[in-house]
Amino acid sequence: MVIDDSNTIRRSAEIFLVQAGCQVVLAEDGFDALAKIADHQPSVIFCDIMMPRLDGYQTCSLIKKNARFKATPVIMLSSKDGLFDRAR
């Protein structure tokens, strides 16, 4: 699953992942992802940090609180490189 508010980033990630043989589910924000996650049960989730409405940290937290998806890897994507952001 790729969660990003940027259509360009979502589509680029989809192209690369499909070429690698992955099935890809796209979500435009955290709420969209939470609505789709139970139906698609992704094996890995790529999540942008900076999104409107529900940011990546909040989205990740909600995913991890669900026992069904607690072990699902969530890879956070960001252009931020500050120490605080890396530690978080």
Give the ranges of each region predicted by the language model.
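Receiver (REC) domain active-site loop signature in two-component systems and cognate sites
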Residues: M51
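Short, conserved "switch-loop" micro-motifs in signal-transduction and mechanochemical regulators
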Residues: N66, K80-D81
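Short hydrophobic/Thr-rich beta-strand motif most characteristic of the beta2 strand and flanking loop
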Residues: G21-E28, K36
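Conserved Asp/Asn-Gly motif in the active-site loop of CheY-like receiver
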Residues: A27-F31, R86
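Charged docking surfaces used in two-component/phosphorelay signaling
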Residues: R11-Q19
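Active-site beta3 strand of CheY-like receiver
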Residues: H40-F46
